[in-house]
Structures are given as structure tokens and as C-alpha cells.
């Protein structure tokens, strides 16, 4: 019986080498490499390396900015949201709409021209490289009396483009969206 086992093993070894010729096989990962995960605080939503949160609290622009600064990730404090692309503008508006579906909401952003009229800047210090003003905006409150309009909101008007921007009086009270860089795990 032992001879039979040795003979069968030798036979299978020789024939399997002929039946299945050796080839170079390279194995690639089944899944593509994923980007590094990022972390946002609880109840915040991530979009392209930043965390966002809608607050349905009616506050003046300054109160909203101060409220945002109370939240932090690492050493960074949140600010009223800055917006740098159409996609980000849509994300912010849709974030608001997902929290208050079907209810039109005007929301504060971090854009303002407090220092010099017509020279807009973001509260987080990022560049003013994108805008989506409504047709007649910014108008610095041509119709407002007596206050100027130095703070910017995403507004909803049935006659305006969805997600368009308007400069408004900073003392008006609206809900707002805060933004902060997300933590990246290395």
C-alpha cells in the first residue's frame, strides 16, 4: 500500500505540472485605495475635508459667528460657512433643506464687507474666489433704511434662483451654517 501512495503522488506531481503550466500571476487589491477617513464632530456633516452643521436658531450675523466659534476640532474653531464652489453651495443649501424639508430658509454665511464696502471677505480668512449672487445683488440695502447690508445669506425667494446669495442687514435674525476643517486620520 505504501508503494501505491508513493507512485500516485509522483504521478500526480508530474502530470499536474504538465496540465497546469506555471505563469506569472500578479494579484491586485480587490478594492481601490480609499481616501484617508476624516472625522467630524457628532451631528456634523463632512464635505471635501470640512465639517458643516446647520443650526435652526434665529441669530444676528454676529451672534451666529460667535455661536459657531464655540465649536472646535483640535485647535481649530468653527466659523460661519465659507463657500468656494457651486458644489459646496449646493451641499450647504441641501444640508439646510434636509433639516427643514419643504420650509424655505434664509441662512447666514460667513461672507461680509464690514471693513470696506464692496470688498467681501470670509470670516475664516479663506479667499473670496466664488460667488452666486442673485440677479440684483449685492445692493447694499438700496431699499433698506437706515442700515447698510454688510452680511451675506443664502436666500430663498420663489422668484430667485435657488441657493443664490443676498447681502442683508447684519442685525436681522436667521438660522446659519457653521464650518470647520475635519480631522484626518493618518
Curated annotation (Swiss-Prot):
The keyword Secreted applies. SMART domains: CLECT. It is found in: Secreted. Residues 1-19 form the signal peptide. Residues 47-179 form the C-type lectin domain. GO terms for molecular function: carbohydrate binding. Disulfide bonds join 68-178, 151-170. SUPFAM superfamilies: C-type lectin-like. Keywords: Disulfide bond, Glycoprotein, Lectin, Secreted, Signal. GO terms for cellular component: extracellular region. The keyword Secreted applies. Its main location: secreted. Coiled coil: none annotated. It comes from the Eukaryota. Glycans are attached at residue 58. This is C-type lectin domain family 19 member A. The lineage of its organism: Eukaryota, Metazoa, Chordata, Craniata, Vertebrata. The gene is CLEC19A.
Amino acid at each position: 500500500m505504501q508503494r501505491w501512495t508513493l507512485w500516485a503522488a509522483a504521478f500526480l506531481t508530474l502530470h499536474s505540472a504538465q496540465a497546469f503550466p506555471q505563469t506569472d500571476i500578479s494579484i491586485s487589491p480587490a478594492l481601490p485605495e480609499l481616501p484617508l477617513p476624516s472625522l467630524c464632530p457628532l451631528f456634523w456633516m463632512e464635505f471635501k475635508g470640512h465639517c458643516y452643521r446647520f443650526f435652526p436658531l434665529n441669530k444676528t450675523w454676529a451672534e451666529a459667528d460667535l455661536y459657531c466659534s464655540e465649536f472646535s476640532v483640535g485647535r481649530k474653531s468653527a466659523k460661519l460657512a465659507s463657500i468656494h464652489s457651486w458644489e459646496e453651495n449646493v451641499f450647504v443649501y441641501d444640508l439646510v433643506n434636509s433639516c427643514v424639508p419643504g420650509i424655505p430658509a434664509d441662512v447666514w454665511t460667513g461672507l461680509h464687507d464690514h471693513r470696506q464696502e464692496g470688498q467681501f471677505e470670509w470670516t475664516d480668512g479663506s479667499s473670496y474666489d466664488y460667488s452666486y449672487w442673485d440677479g440684483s445683488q449685492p445692493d447694499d440695502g438700496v431699499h433698506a433704511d437706515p442700515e447698510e447690508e454688510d452680511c451675506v445669506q443664502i436666500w430663498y425667494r420663489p422668484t430667485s434662483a435657488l441657493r443664490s446669495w443676498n447681502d442683508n442687514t447684519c442685525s436681522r435674525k436667521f438660522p446659519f451654517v457653521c464650518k470647520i476643517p475635519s480631522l484626518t486620520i493618518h
